[in-house]
Swiss-Prot record:
Glycans are attached at residues 48, 78, 227, 315, 349, 457, 472, 534, 583, 689, 738-739, 769. Optimum temperature is 30 degrees Celsius. GO terms for biological process: xylan catabolic process. Residues 1-22 form the signal peptide. The keyword Oxidoreductase does not apply. The keyword Transcription does not apply. It is found in: Secreted. It comes from the Eukaryota. It comes from Emericella nidulans (strain FGSC A4 / ATCC 38163 / CBS 112.46 / NRRL 194 / M139). It catalyses: an alpha-D-glucuronoside + H2O = D-glucuronate + an alcohol. This is Alpha-glucuronidase A. Belongs to the glycosyl hydrolase 67 family.
């Protein structure tokens, strides 16, 4: 009964308001729900259910799901049914079903976590190889029902890989440079606050439920940049409570570790992995954790990267470091995921060393270590060689590890891809990675087969998704971004799944069965990654974001001239990294022969990776016949134009989605449309300034509808030179003369009488909440505040730059000829009410 009450409490939240908390598990009524009643079960029969375990959870999930979707109450029968024709759902393990006298001869072979689902009218059989598998099968059955799929079926489903984990980059404390959740845009940590585990772990239980519903099986609950205090007695007790919250859903808990903990926490004078005291210390800590959490999944370790300690301090190898933890885990059956994200961020020198290349680091550090890792070590490899860019080639390290299992690290949180403020559906990108054939030894070597263990006959391997949910009821900060979490889980289970089919499953369960709703969200989502790539970074140049600050707004110059290694090597004549063997960094040579030959040769390198592998003049012709620079111009205009269509598309389904979620999504799509223009102008102006080559279409730098703020009549405002220059339309904006007096910028309008859209581009810094008022003559058109830092969840910035640039548009404004437009800016805190420009746009025109 306790399980039932808890689950009902969790599900009941969605009935109060459609705030996103239930995500795709709303169990909302489907069209014509009552007409299905005769084909639905009336009884739930859980086999060998124990309170707080997955079979028990499955039973109550079925009760709530069938009631929510169809309005039909079903009863729970806690003993084996004696009538095989009874309209019942029987749920349990294969073993329990056989022990109860069931016929398992027709059940296909199942592996750990696999399940068998048989639906014959109202008689349903859900069997798992283990309890977790039975729960997965239950969720699959309910998700079919939630999509209106009630027809008879019979099939088995096995996971593609044993490791289907989530990484949460949650910090024990808020503050610092990365807040409560590093690269998290959905609010504070659901696990930690003020240096300890939260008292209320309701959201942890809800999270486990979501993850189990898509076939995931473990969560690393703390940041890879780990704080050693996660291992204090109080916090080990606390993480045991998190594990308790996860356990009803079959989700296991794992921890990120700080390599130097024996010294920084344990009081030793060393953290050398060969020192017997260090070995004993880790063994004792691991024993203590398993006493508290007998089903703990294992550890995640980031070592010798971006300031994190590791074995290099003592001239030990990465294998030595990984094996330290692996051996401590072996008596308990645990696994260590050891990150391949290892590079020197302090000494890489772009200017002095043409062959220096961060993309080479993983292979250079791990090559030759393959036979040395313990069997319970899995190398966790980012999908690309750099860092979750809008497009990268597959990491070559997957081809270098045959005796050691590997897992692909994918990023659900959109660190470089719009931080959930821009719609970017990531499944098509991930599919390109998982379907890529590395041709190891001239044989089929698809990435998904490598990480599953099939290609090299490894028993371990799989997936690690960096998700970073928070306390926001949308989980990720955006309702639409949750499609990425859903797709991640589904692809980890079955990498052959289709991106569109996954998306449409999610839409029906999250929003509506209405075909127009399905079509609109499908169109927007499937166009979103190409659009973002077009207006952020093309041809493999990487996401041209500000890599030195929040990884959010445009700042292409920040890529170069520093040791972070995300270089473009752009100068006045040419652009791109030469990663060839014959003349460059040799990165192409890290790939197996067939792939190496493709990337080494500029003629066979795909255009979308041209600048990743080759340094070329701006006038280099692509396979399309366009020059590189003209492609940049065209792509940025095309991508930003696509983003404008998302707003109008979304508006067509108004009234078909609840108001709360409709308005929340609309706000972000309007913001994205404006910020896409900021991206477009910043990148095109930057490369026009650098190359001196004009846009053949005459668009770049030519904005006839704009009025630059610095050209207006100013009272209490003054011009300000923006850095980087391309972040402002004319390199300048205006700011109030001081932080206590309002400013006014005015200009007569030279337009004909009529209706126009008035767009104002401004900067919303995270150091105050300025207010702006827009007037036509003495009439107030509109007012807004600089409070996006409280709404969007993106990385905050105190600067006037591409991260804080924003746009507001007032539609269908009647303007009389010779009217005077004025903007009054009222500063707040340290924010001086900055304005970039105003556009007076004929209706339907985007400048």
């Amino acid at each position: 009964m306790r399980s039932f009450l808890l689950l009902t409490a969790l599900l009941g939240v969605a009935a109060v308001a459609e705030d996103g908390l239930a995500a795709w598990l709303r169990y909302a009524p489907i069209p014509h729900a009552k007409s299905y009643h005769k084909n639905l079960p009336s009884v739930i029969v859980p086999l060998n259910a124990t309170a707080g375990r997955p079979i028990d959870t499955a039973a109550y999930e079925l009760v709530d799901g069938i009631k929510g979707i169809f309005g039909k109450r079903v009863t729970l029968k806690n003993e084996t049914r004696d009538d095989p024709n009874l309209p019942a759902v029987t749920v349990g393990t294969v073993e329990a079903y056989a022990e109860a006298g069931g016929d398992v001869s027709s059940v296909p072979e199942l592996i750990d976590d696999g399940y068998y689902l048989s639906v014959a009218g109202p008689s349903v059989l859900i069997l798992g190889q283990n309890e977790r598998g039975a729960l997965y099968g239950t969720f699959q059955y309910l998700e079919r029902l939630a999509q209106g799929k009630v027809s008879d079926t019979s099939f088995a489903s096995n996971p593609s890989a044993p490791i289907r984990w989530v990484n949460q980059w949650d910090n024990l404390q808020d503050g610092g440079t990365h807040g409560s959740v590093e690269r998290g845009y959905g609010g504070d940590s659901i696990f930690f606050w003020d240096g300890r585990v939260r008292d209320d772990l309701t959201r942890a239980s809800q999270y486990a439920r979501l993850l189990a519903s898509i076939g995931l099986n473990a969560v690393i609950v703390n940041n890879v940049n780990a704080n050693e205090t996660i291992l204090t007695q109080e916090n080990m007790d606390g993480v045991a409570r998190i594990a308790d919250a996860f356990r009803p859903y079959g989700i296991q808990l794992g921890l990120s570790l700080n390599f130097a903990s024996p010294q920084s926490l344990g009081g030793l004078d060393t953290f050398d992995p060969f020192d017997e005291r260090v070995i004993s210390w880790w063994g004792e800590i691991t024993d203590e954790l398993y006493e508290r959490i007998p089903d703990m999944a294992g550890y995640l370790v980031k070592a010798n990267s971006e300031g994190q300690p590791g074995p290099f301090t003592y001239n030990r190898t990465l294998a030595d470091g990984a094996n330290l933890f692996a051996r401590a885990l072996q008596p308990h059956g645990g696994i260590v995921l050891f990150r391949a994200f290892v590079y020197d961020h302090e000494n890489l020198n772009e200017t002095l060393d043409w062959k220096a290349d961060r993309a080479n680091a993983a292979v250079e550090f791990f090559d030759g270590l393959d036979p040395q890792f313990e069997d319970n070590v899995v190398i966790q490899i980012k999908n690309g060689p750099i860092d979750f860019q809008v497009r990268e080639p597959v990491s070559p390290l997957f081809a270098h590890l045959s005796q050691t299992a590997s897992a692909v690290e994918l990023q659900v949180t959109q660190e470089y891809l719009g931080q959930q403020c821009h719609l970017v559906y990531l499944a098509p990108m991930w599919k390109e990675v998982l379907d890529f054939d590395l041709r190891v030894d001239g044989k089929d070597s698809v990435v998904s087969d490598i990480v599953s263990g099939r290609r090299f006959n490894n028993t371990l391997g799989g997936y690690a998704g960096v998700v970073n949910v928070g306390l926001n009821t949308t989980w990720l900060g955006s309702h639409l971004a949750m499609s990425n979490l859903y797709a991640y889980g589904r692809l980890a289970w079955d990498p052959s799944a289709d991106s569109v089919e996954l998306l449409q499953e999610w839409i029906k369960m999250t929003f509506s069965h209405d075909q127009e709703v399905v079509d609109v969200i499908t169109k927007m989502s499937m166009e979103s990654w190409p659009a973002y790539e077009n207006y952020s970074g093309n041809l493999g140049i990487q996401t041209l974001t500000d890599i030195l600050l929040g990884h959010y707004g445009p700042n292409p110059a920040s890529q170069d001239g520093n040791p972070w290694g995300q270089w473009t090597r752009a100068d006045a004549d040419s652009i791109g990294m030469d990663r060839t063997v014959w003349n460059g960094t040799g990165n192409a040579g890290q790939y197996p022969e067939e792939v190496y030959q493709m990337y080494e040769n500029i003629d066979t390198t795909p255009d979308n990776l041209l600048l990743w592998f080759h340094h070329v003049p701006y006038t280099q012709r692509l396979k399309s016949g366009k020059t590189v620079i003209q492609h940049f111009y065209d792509a940025h205009y095309r991508g930003s134009a696509t983003a404008q269509t998302f707003v109008s598309l979304w508006k067509t389904i108004k009234g078909k989605i609840d108001k709360e979620r409709y308005e929340h999504v609309l706000f972000r799509l309007v913001y994205q449309a404006g910020h896409a223009l900021v991206w477009r102008d910043s990148i095109t102006n930057f490369y026009y300034n650098k190359s001196g080559i004009p846009d053949e279409a005459g668009r770049v730098g030519n904005h006839p509808y704009r009025i630059e703020a610095e050209d207006m009549e100013l009272d209490g405002y003054e011009p300000y030179l923006v850095s980087p220059f391309e972040a402002a339309s004319g390199s300048h904006c205006i700011v109030t003369s001081n932080n206590s007096t309002e400013g006014r910028a005015s200009t007569p309008l030279k337009v004909k009488n009529g209706k126009y859209d008035i767009a104002v581009n401004y900067f919303d810094q995270a150091i105050g909440n300025s207010t702006w008022r827009l007037f036509l003559d003495d009439d107030l058109v509109g007012e807004w505040k600089g409070d996006l830092e409280y709404i969007l969840g993106r990385a905050p910035s105190p600067y006037i730059d591409g991260q804080t640039a924003a746009r507001i548009t007032f539609k269908h404004v009647h303007i009389k000829s010779r009217s005077t437009l004025s903007i009054v800016g009222i500063p707040d805190g340290m924010e001086p009410a900055p304005i970039d420009y105003v556009s007076i746009l004929p209706e339907g025109v985007i400048d």
